[in-house]
């Protein structure tokens, strides 16, 4: 599922992504579902994270959605420190708009208006394609203010990692995005409750 468009569409062409039903899920979510509906669907799906721990994605979204805060964040951890690991790289290079769409849906579900993609600087093709995808999505009104005319605002920034293995760990990555040395934080509190800049983060 995650790789369905890789090698099928031109990853630098938003129209090709849209032609294979890209951004339809975001449109459906924003126009016919509540944030709780989205969290419930993800919970029922049984989807788990790709990082190895297998934590249920819906549970994490539920924790963040239920956390009371005026500011929340969605962070994509695309910092692969394991030698020879290309799980994230494959998706980022082959289907970057899918990553952006998923992050926007997650943002709606938890009440976030800002996202970050933390990607290794050693992946220049992935970085380049993400930059193009973000620019295209903004031009099409799929990132930024009032997406699909619904009043939902969500934008994404790139942050380049310096290749430190430890920044693959989620709390170290958050510390790095904040501009500090990437060192893991004690848990609890977990990022879904107190994450980036001390705010709920998935």
Label every PLM stretch briefly.
Residues 9, 17-24, 76-88, 191-197:
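Gly-rich Lys/Arg/Thr-decorated short loops/hinges at beta-loop-alpha junctions or inter-strand turns
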Residues 1-45, 112-117:
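Iron-sulfur (Fe-S) cluster-binding modules
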Residues 35-38, 44, 68-73, 86-87, ...:
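Short coil/turn connectors at secondary-structure junctions
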């Amino acid at each position: 599922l995650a790789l369905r468009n890789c090698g099928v569409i031109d990853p630098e062409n938003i129209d090709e992504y849209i032609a294979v039903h890209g951004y339809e899920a975001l449109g459906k979510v924003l126009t016919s579902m509540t944030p709780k509906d989205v969290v419930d669907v993800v919970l029922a799906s049984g989807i788990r994270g790709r990082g190895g721990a297998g934590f249920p994605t819906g549970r994490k979204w539920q924790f963040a959605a239920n956390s009371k805060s005026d500011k929340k964040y969605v962070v994509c951890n695309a910092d692969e420190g394991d030698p020879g690991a290309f799980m994230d790289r494959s998706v980022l290079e082959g289907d970057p708009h899918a990553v952006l769409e998923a992050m926007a849906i997650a943002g709606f579900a938890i009440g976030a208006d800002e996202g970050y993609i933390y990607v290794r600087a050693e992946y220049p093709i992935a970085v380049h394609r993400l930059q193009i995808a973000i620019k295209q999505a903004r031009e099409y009104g799929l990132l930024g203010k009032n997406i699909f005319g619904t009043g939902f605002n969500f934008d994404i920034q790139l942050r380049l990692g310096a290749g430190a293995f430890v920044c693959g760990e989620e709390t170290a990555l958050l510390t790095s995005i904040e501009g500090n040395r990437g060192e893991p934080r004690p848990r609890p509190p977990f990022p879904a409750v107190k994450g980036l800049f001390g705010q709920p983060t998935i």
